[in-house]
Amino acid sequence: MAQYRVIKMLRKITEAQKEKALMTLELLTENPAGIGDHSTHDFYNNAEEAIKALAEADDVLDTIERYYPE
């Protein structure tokens, strides 16, 4: 039982990380006013970090689903 609580916790943490990455990409692409005083370099770095975080979250969720389907 505890094993599945750990998996449930990992799933929820990763889902939250995915939502954070999606929100960041949304702010960067659809709400330029939210960017503020960031330089172009900061903008690109933030976008790159967000897309990598999104890909990592998707990979983790896929792995959890493969080995511990709901």
Q: Where in this protein do the model-derived segments appear?
A:
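Extended, charge-rich alpha-helical interface modules
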Residues: A2-E70
